[in-house]
Amino acid sequence: MKKVILKTSLSLAVAMASTQLFASGLALNEQSISGMGTGFAGRSSAADDASTVFGNPAGMSRLKRQQVTGGLATIDASTDINDASGNQSGTNKGDMVPFTAIPMAYYVKPIDDQWAFGLGVYAPFGLNTDYENSFQGRNFSSKKGEIKVVTFQPTVSYAFNDKVSIGFGPTINRMSASLESALTTPLSPNDGNVQIKGDDIGYGYNIGVLVQATDTTRVGLTYHSKVKYKLEGHTEVSPGAGTPGALLRGARYDASVDFTSPESADLSVTQDLNDAWKLYAGATWTRWSRLKDITVQNEGITASAGGLLAPSAISTIKEEQNWHDTWAYAIGTSYQLNKQWVLRTGLSFDQSPTNNTNRSPRIPTGDRTIFSIGAGWSPTDDLTIDVAYSYLKEEKVKVNNSNQLGQSYSAEYENSANGFGVGATYRF
């Protein structure tokens, strides 16, 4: 009798994001609307508003007034699936990422000429996917998934002088996951179902330095630490109709998985060309090579509770990932049209961490190019309203998956997305 292989979607909970979401690897970029307008070039050196709490906490030293910055970024993703084949029937509609909204909020208060204090609430990771139930590659992909990671970051900065400042903030990160995937075995012609829920709180930090190298050149370096999670929750298994209960039957188990989100470093430069023009450039390194594999541990599995096949099929589930480190590069510019208006644009190039051997419908990502435009309007000295638009286009990539049940799926994926953002900064 063939061994039942249960390919759960808890790996998505660990990876924590859909690659259609303007991601560097799987990390969301939407933490600043003003930064979105320049393609996040100069993320560590711009310090234009309170969102510098995330971009570079040392940048708080440049903000001379108490202020709050908030915003909302929305993402409308599209996926085309072509040349699909497999030994199971099904559909390949694509467009599995629903319309998504990502909020953010920051606060900065200068204490004196040297010290500043700030707070940030933002989403560093996220997921929202929804394949159709009849998806042909359902044994290698989540049917539905929602991951929420919310970070709270209290922050302080210190200016040694008018040239050099540093900043530091611990991060408190809460992740919750709810995922659903298909379970198809030779024991039944009908699909079963696996639903996984879990949550955890992880801790890290964000540290940065900002240097005014010349009167017109500013350099920033920011380091975001790794964060360790231990997702704990439960797995619910519902075999397809007709599956012999003595072999595999519906049950609920305690589940856990250890995961470490990667550290990243961003180096940015802001260059004042004249009174109107600014040039931004940046590079971000992310240590995605931490993600070698994903191992899910399900506890309390016995043959009497789950069927004869349950202990060998469900107790430990391991999926190879073998990701590699990535670099993202960005260049952007802004033009101060007048006292009220600033115009922005940027271009970004972002590597994918996946490889051709292990890539699956769960994370069918390729290298991407992102074009961005934006604007800021300041009707008064106290208020600035920012808007931004980004268009993302990925290279075509192929997935080619098979498992020990003899099931297979291959297809060509092409992803794109439109991102819109609106935010405001109020100074008081």
Task: Tell me the role of every PLM-derived stretch.
Residues S24-G39, G86-N92, F99-F428:
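Outer-membrane beta-barrel porins/channels
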Residues F40-D48, A77-P98:
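Surface-exposed strand-loop-strand hairpins of Gram-negative outer-membrane beta-barrel proteins
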Residues M1-S9:
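Bacterial N-terminal signal peptides that target proteins for export
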Residues V14:
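Acidic, glycine/polar-enriched metal-coordinating patches/loops
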Residues L26-G42, S61-T79:
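Transmembrane beta-strand segments of Gram-negative outer membrane beta-barrel proteins
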Residues R43-A47, V53-Q66, Y107-D113:
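Outer-membrane beta-barrel pore proteins
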